A protein has these predicted regions:
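Active-site pocket-lining/capping segments in soluble small-molecule metabolic enzymes
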Residues: 1-8, 15-222
Length: 222
């Protein structure tokens, strides 16, 4: 997911048949359309990840990914002894920068059809997720009633919920989702205003584990 355009693909055309688009450009439909057209013209399969909980342009991403192959959990514990966390997203959210979740790269289940016409594979991160069936059900049915943060991986335990229904009903969401300055934020105030609309106390309406188990049965057995 470090391919930012066709230039990165051209030197290795004979080495791959599928690839994933850069997370940082996931919400840019015009860019995704161009990459999808190029992929089809060259016989390649284009994919994207829909539920990444990573910060947009996270400066710790490469470091964090490297730790996956080098005893990440052990090194994390060592780091904690020195007051250092390898999870910069956690540190960032601990500081109260909750609007950064809205300007990240995840895709709402209801918005997925906007992107599916350009990609052939939609990846869902569930390997270490606490509620994998809930994630599968949400994206398979293009519908989710609850806290959007529960769908992402990593999933930070925010003090309140990102109400998906409120997000879908907000006139600000399309502007934030398709913001042309997403990778060079001007801090215009839209994300902060949107946070005020959708960041709500956790409630009884959020899906339970029992709901997730039922959804799993419906999804796989009909």
């Amino acid at each position: 997911m470090r391919i930012h355009g066709t230039v990165g693909c051209e030197p290795i055309l004979e080495l791959f048949d599928s690839f994933y688009a850069s997370r940082e450009h996931h919400r840019d439909l015009a860019w995704l359309a161009r990459l999808g057209e190029w992929s089809r013209a060259h016989g390649k399969v284009l994919g994207m990840q829909a539920n990444s909980g990573c910060l947009r342009q996270c400066p710790f991403q490469q470091f964090h990914d490297n730790l996956h192959g080098h005893n990440r959990m052990g090194q994390s514990k060592v780091g904690e002894q020195f007051g250092f966390s390898v999870f910069r997203c956690k540190t960032n959210y601990d500081r109260g920068n909750y609007e950064d979740f809205l300007r990240a790269t995840w895709i709402r289940p209801e918005d997925l059809p906007l992107y599916e016409e350009h990609v052939e594979v939609v990846k869902l991160a569930t390997r270490r997720h606490a509620h994998p069936v809930e994630v599968l059900n949400a994206y398979a049915t293009y519908s989710y009633d609850g806290d959007l943060a529960r769908l992402t991986d990593p999933s930070y335990p925010f003090p309140q919920a990102f109400d998906n229904a409120a997000l879908g009903a907000s006139s600000l969401w399309p502007q934030v989702r398709s913001c042309p300055d997403a990778n060079d934020c001007r801090h215009c105030g839209r994300c902060t205003a949107l946070l005020g609309e959708v960041f709500r106390p956790h409630g009884a309406g959020e899906p339970s584990d029992a709901h997730a188990a039922s959804a799993f049965t419906r999804f796989y057995k009909g």
